[in-house]
Each structure stands twice: as C-alpha cells, then as structure tokens.
A protein has these predicted regions:
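A short beta-strand-turn-helix
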Residues: 72-93, 265-285, 305-310
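Bacterial N-terminal signal peptides
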Residues: 42-52
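Thiol-based oxidoreductase modules, predominantly thioredoxin-like and allied folds used
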Residues: 123-148, 163-173, 315-329, 341-352
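Short, internal strand/loop/helix patches
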Residues: 146-185, 189-190, 197-198, 333-368
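Thiol-/selenol-based redox modules, centered on thioredoxin-like
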Residues: 192-265, 367-407
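Short pre-active-site segment immediately N-terminal to redox-active cysteine/selenocysteine motifs
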Residues: 91-93, 98-101, 283-285, 290-293, ...
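Conserved redox-active cysteine motifs that mediate thiol-disulfide chemistry
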Residues: 99-111, 289-306
C-alpha cells in the first residue's frame, strides 16, 4: 500500500516542489511560503504557551507559613453553609482537605474523628473540605472506594462513617481549595488563635496506624495550646493528588480510550458455565445473567460497566452471560457494543436453557437479572436475585477485596 504524502516544512519554496505531496501543499499555501512558515511558527508557539498555561493552572502553590487563613463560605453535608467566622471561638483551627475516593484519606478517617474528640474540649476546631472536581476523577481512580467525590455521595459517607466534624464541598469551583493549595488528600493546615498558618502537611508519618512514629498534628496542637512553637512546621504530604478541574481533559481521553476497546461475545456451553462457577481465575468474579428482552437487565447494565471500570485493575473480573437464544447473537452483540462492555461476555450456546442453568447454579430458577459475586476459592459471597442495589454491590466487592488484599 503506498505511503501518504510527505510534507517538508523547511528550505525555500522551490525545494518543496521536489517533495512527494508538494502539489497538495502548494495548493494550500500558494506562493506565500514565508507567510505560511510564520503562521505555522506562531501556531506552534501559541500551542506551547497554552499547554504551559494549563499545566501552571494545575500547579497550585500551597499557602505559606505565617499566612492568614483564607476566608470561605461552603456548603456542608449537614445542609448548612459554613464560613471561617463560624470557627472564630476556636483557639486553634485545623483545616483538613480530604475526600471520599482516596484510600489514604479513608485510612485517616477514624484517626481524625478521634483527634476531634480528644481536642474539642481544649478549644480546637476541625473542618474538612473536599477539594476535588468530581469530573476530574477517572473511574479507575475509584478502585478503592464505593463512593465518588460528588456532594451527594459526600453526604452518604459522612453519615455512614459518623463524621463528627463539618465536611464541606468545594468541587464546583475549587476557589477555596486554590487559596489554600492542598497538594493531596489528606492535607492539613493548622492555624493559631490569630488564624496564622503554623503547620501544613501530613496528619502523621504513616497511613498504616501500626507504623506511625510521629504524630505531627497532635504534636502541633499540643504545642500551640501550650503557647509554644510546633516542633515541626511543614512536612511532605503522601496521598492522592488533588483533582483540579484541568484534569477533565485527561478523564475525557481516558473515556475515549475505554470506548475504543473491542467488544465480543462467545457462546457458553455447560462445561464453560461450570468452569465459570468454579472460578479458578485467582480473582473475585462478578457474574451477571441478563437478556436483551429483560427491562430491568437493560436498565441496570450501565451500572455493571461502571463497576467493572472501577475495579478491573484489582483482583477482579466481570462476566456477563446472556440467556438469549443463540440465533439472537447479533442483537446481543449490538447491545453490548452500544454499552461499551469490553469485559468477557458469554451467550447461552443452546436453547435448552435448563441444562445450562443447572450447570452454573442448580439453586437458580432461571429468572433474570441474576447476579453473583464469587471469591477466588469458588464460593458465592454475594447474590442478588433481582435488580442490583449498585451501592450495596460495590460495598460487597470492596469489603471482600480489601479483606483479602488491603491497599
């Protein structure tokens, strides 16, 4: 197959005529070669500056030590707006930047609650702010959580984990977060009675509580309450990078890559289904039985695609099994492609469904949707005989995987 035209954007105009494809280029630029080159040069320069500007927008500087606490008015999960003035009575104010999805932040939640309990009577207030743009978080970054960073799901986490501190949302504009400059979650900023920044950094020196040797936040609070200088004023911050709005383009590119993945379907006989149920993959296996004519199956299918994209980089796999008849394979594949289901997809190989149903699960009567989660030893640890509760299913998956292999 012949190669495409080659354009050489160097040398003087006449030299271009010697290059293959030059007639096309000549038609585009005419005789004004110098003008064309100048335009091309400024286009390249402009693109470089644009990209540099986008990068700079993501490199938000952290608030310097000694700076005053930036003011804020942000909505809380408790239904009210909170301002900096609401904490005016505190001797010391801790501003914690945290979020739902980050496993590091999750590790610290119980410790933060205990710090609030231990220091509340001493005049210390703590407020948590979620700094991430939810639309700048990729699905695979949700692999260690059941919840995303939306305001609605912040409310769920705060309630389920009984947060004893205000949890505020800044994901729409990130204006407050940009004023403080958290580099990751969790990141704490500690202000004295005059609301001057006295400490910025990590809560302690390890997300694993059994490995903690230095309690930076507690040591800072003790020192400030005693009228002393904190022993440490700044540390590195280990955690999930703050998801500034500029990362939306990365998410878009990621979703386009997922959409381009091939989608196939294979026929499954009784032997295939017995092997599917046995599960010798070494992974947790989520299996969903469905059909194109099943309205609840169709309605919930997007949830399964999302769940697979969240967890597939861990010890997890998702398999769909259509109980449509073999002669309906074309419509099954069309549906799967429309849903971008690039996971493993199977279709009953025979219209004799009862034998195939029994091969997978003799206790299953054949109604769809039917969903099971199988552990690496082949035991069904979660079963749903009707439409799934997406949150409950995510939690079952998370619990099982984290107990087996915590982050």
């Amino acid at each position: 197959m012949p190669n495409g035209p080659e354009f050489v954007l160097a040398g003087d105009g006449p030299a271009l005529e010697k290059q293959r494809g030059a007639p096309v280029l000549a038609a585009l630029i005419g005789n004004d070669y110098d003008g064309f080159m100048k335009s091309w040069f400024w286009l390249v320069v402009g693109s470089v500056f644009l990209l540099a500007g986008l990068r700079a927008a993501e490199n938000i500087p952290a608030l310097p030590l000694g700076a005053s606490a930036p003011d804020f008015t942000l909505p809380g999960v408790d239904g009210r707006d909170w301002t900096l003035k609401d904490f005016s009575g505190a001797k010391v104010l801790v501003v914690l930047f945290t979020c739902n999805h980050c496993p590091t932040a999750q590790y610290y939640e119980e410790r933060v609650k205990q710090i609030v309990t231990d220091y509340k009577s001493k005049g210390v207030s703590l407020v948590a702010i979620m700094p991430n743009d939810p639309n700048s978080v990729r699905l695979d970054e949700l692999g260690w959580t059941d919840l995303n960073d939306s305001f609605a799901e912040m409310k769920i986490r705060a309630k389920d984990h009984q947060f004893n501190f205000p949890y505020l949302y800044d994901g729409d504009t990130e204006t407050v977060s940009r004023a403080y400059g958290p580099v990751a979650t969790p990141h704490v900023f500690v202000f004295d009675a005059q609301r001057k920044l006295r400490y910025a950094g990590a809560i302690d020196d390890s997300e694993r509580v059994q490995h903690v040797k230095k309690h930076y936040l507690r040591e800072t609070l003790n020192a400030l309450l005693a009228g002393k200088e904190p022993p440490t004023t700044q540390t590195k911050v280990v955690g999930c990078s703050t998801k500034w709005a500029g990362k939306q383009e990365q998410v878009k590119a990621y979703m386009e890559k997922l959409a381009a993945e091939p989608v196939t379907v294979a026929r499954a006989d009784a032997e295939t289904l017995r092997a599917l149920r046995k599960n010798d993959s070494g992974k947790f296996r989520l299996v969903n039985f469905w059909a194109t004519w099943c309205a609840p199956c169709v309605a919930e299918f997007d949830e399964f695609v999302t769940i697979n994209r969240m967890y597939r980089h861990r010890d997890f796999e998702f398999v769909t099994v259509s109980i449509n008849r073999p002669d309906e394979e074309k419509s099954v594949l069309e549906f799967l492609k429309k849903k971008q289901a690039s996971n493993r997809n199977l279709l009953f190989a025979s219209s004799e469904r009862e034998a195939l149903i029994n091969a997978f699960d003799p206790d299953w009567q054949g109604a769809v949707p039917y969903t099971v989660l199988i552990n690496p030893e082949g035991k069904i640890i979660h079963r749903e005989l009707d439409s799934i509760d997406p949150l409950a299913l995510k939690r079952a998956i998370q619990k099982a995987m984290n107990e087996r292999k915590p982050w």
